[in-house]
Structures are given as C-alpha cells and as structure tokens.
C-alpha cells in the first residue's frame, strides 16, 4: 500500500516513521510519501490561498497547486483503484467499516486542507479521475486535515494483513465483526488488587463460558450507555 500526503505542513507526517507504522514501512507493508503543496507554486511567496469568491471570512486554497501536484504524484489518467481522501468536517463520518474497506486499497492519497478549505473544483476534478472520499472524524472542526489524515491512516493500516503481530486481537475490538459492532468490554491485568480496586472475580475464575458471558454483557451495557445509536432491538434497546 502506498500512502501519499499533500499538505503545507509535511513535517506533520514525520511521526509515521515511529511505532508499528514505522515498522510496517521498514517491512515493506506500506510506502509513505509526504509532499509540500507549496512545491507546486510559482510565485516568490509560494502562495496557496486566495480570497473566497462571493465574499466571506478567511481564505480558500487555490486549485492550481493541487492540480499540478495531482499530475505529478498520481498522473493524468483516470484510475478508480486510487483512493483520494479529503478530510473535512462536512464529509461523511469515518467508521470502522470504512477503514476495513480502505485497508485493501493499493494507493491512498490524503489531501489536507487548511484555512477555510479547498476550492471545490479540486474535489470535483479528483472525483472525475479517481475514487474520492470526503470524510469527517466527528462533529468538530480542526485547523487542518493533517490530524485527521493521521488518524485515518492508523485506523486503516492496522487492518492490513501482516501489520498486527496477533491478528486475533482485531476480532474483539470495538466496532469489529467479532464484537457484532459493539464497544469493547473493560480490560484488566495484574495485580489483581490495586489501590483498593479488584479485578472482577469472574475474570480470575478460569471458567471460559462465564468469562465470555461477562464480556458480552459488559459490551452490551457500555454500548447502550455510551453509543445507543449502535444498538438494536436484539439488545433490548431501539436502534
């Protein structure tokens, strides 16, 4: 999988060299390239923004640098196997199922906007050439798309076969198929007693059936309490 990042702050992505993502790059599972959008400007000030058409506050990222960057990084031929992601608060919510879908992609290009956003013709052009995703991490606004791109990267790449040392650990995470889309149950480790708080007795019983039932019940309880939108009538709570 090749990952490209277009940003006016490419140093944001230096963190991809560390931890498991860095190991994945060393092992050849992923190939990471961060690009400075200003490299495709032609004026002394390396300008990437201009005032919005129709008036209004703030600045909008100009289409020209994006177009030239696309031509050089992706090419000028349509290719639906290339996934281009525009992080945006007006995008569709990013979910675990979206991460799973993207984990089989061969090429992902992240377009990280700043200021008030990117000229929409850039998105329209990209959609005419490649597979475009406008995605949001949640109902809040960030200063730019870099943080969102990093979060999406981690959610996607950890699902690539060979990335996780123990792939079974993916099956019991929140939102996973192994959890039926529920939130993960609470986790505990040793010592059994810590500052007056004990590990639930059932987890130390060695009784696998009781442990499985406790974990399932806790997953349902937490999901109903914190994310009722994820539940359905099977758990006694309307969707």
Swiss-Prot record:
Subcellular location(s) of the protein: Cytoplasm
Top-level enzyme category: transferase
UniProt function note: Specifically methylates guanosine-37 in various tRNAs.
Keyword Protein transport found: no
EC number: 2.1.1.228
Entry GO terms, CC: cytosol
Protein name in the entry: tRNA (guanine-N(1)-)-methyltransferase
Predominant location category: cytoplasm
GO molecular function: tRNA (guanine(37)-N1)-methyltransferase activity
Keyword S-adenosyl-L-methionine: yes
SUPFAM superfamilies in the cross-refs: alpha/beta knot (SSF75217)
